[in-house]
Regions:
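Glycine/tyrosine- and acidic-biased, solvent-exposed loop/turn segments at the edges of beta-strands
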Residues: 14-276
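Sec-dependent signal peptide recognition
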Residues: 2-10
């Protein structure tokens, strides 16, 4: 009888142990199973979003997919031996929001597929775009050129100095100035020579530069802020003025058109499950 009870007790203990299962933990970018580096396909949550991906000896390796709450794809990231080599971000409608390539090239898109900005890593050159697809601003380490919506140059900096673009500075009776190119006013300058407003061809504000504060603000033709920069950071917006891409010091944040923060990395990980 005692042997039977002992055997039943042993089986009960073994069942309890089995019910406990393996303890998975994602720590400092490494996946562990009962304290040992794990290998396999896993599913987990970062904040409110589900993530699926493969780990080899604890390190992320291969394709990782992150999903919105409705199940649509939010991000695809490719890892090789723990290092992320490329990333694609998506709107909820399935259109591409951003592409961060292995060679360092970057492209960001509106949800209709038109380009917002591109960065050529080889040339170390960035291009921002008007809503009609023409370049808004092209810049590199030596030169920055600003265009209106008709692809006409309204300002050019070379080595931080303004260059001659064939424009004439005209002083008005109230002490302010106008910068005229051909028959078109391309910029207005206040009497203190501190604030300059570059203009679209139809007169709307294009870029405001405040020399006293160092702030710059770019505008869509509808008057909403396209991009705003100041010391230590900048923010790039959607057409309706909502934030799309924000830089604050060393941190970067990307938002979809509904204002949802697109989470990258493995922060706030919960609900880890091994799929195979």
């Amino acid at each position: 009888m005692k042997k039977i009870l002992s055997a039943l007790l042993l089986i009960f203990v073994m069942l309890l142990s089995a019910c406990g299962g393996v303890k998975y933990e994602l720590k400092d970018g490494l996946m562990f199973a009962d304290g040992k580096e794990a290998t396999g396909n896993f599913e987990f949550k970062t904040g409110k979003y589900k993530v699926k991906g493969n780990f080899v000896n604890g390190l992320p390796d291969g394709l990782f997919e992150e999903y919105y709450e409705d199940g649509s794809i939010m991000a695809k990231e490719t890892f090789v031996n723990g290092e992320m080599t490329s990333k694609e971000l998506y709107y909820k409608n399935g259109n591409l929001l951003g592409n961060f390539a292995e060679n360092g090239d970057i492209k960001l898109y509106y949800d209709d597929g038109s380009l917002i900005l591109s960065y050529d890593a080889e040339k170390e050159e960035y291009t921002y775009y008007h809503e009609n697809g023409n370049p808004f601003m092209i810049g590199n380490s030596n030169e920055t050129t600003l265009y209106n919506e008709n692809n006409e140059v309204v300002s050019k900096l070379r080595d931080d100095d303004l260059t001659d673009i064939g424009a004439t500075l005209k002083k008005l009776d109230d002490g302010t100035f106008e910068l005229v190119k051909g028959n078109e006013v391309i910029a207005k300058i206040d009497a203190n020579d501190e604030i300059i407003n570059y203009l679209y061809s139809t007169g709307e504000p294009l870029l405001k530069v405040n020399e006293s504060t160092g702030e710059t603000e770019f505008f869509f033709k509808n008057g909403n802020t396209f991009m705003k920069g100041k010391e230590g950071g900048s923010i790039l917006n959607y057409r309706d003025g909502k934030p799309l891409y924000e830089i604050n010091g060393d941190s970067e944040t990307i938002y979809n058109e509904e204002g949802d923060k697109i989470v990258g990395g493995f922060d706030l990980v919960t609900d880890i499950k091994k799929l195979d």
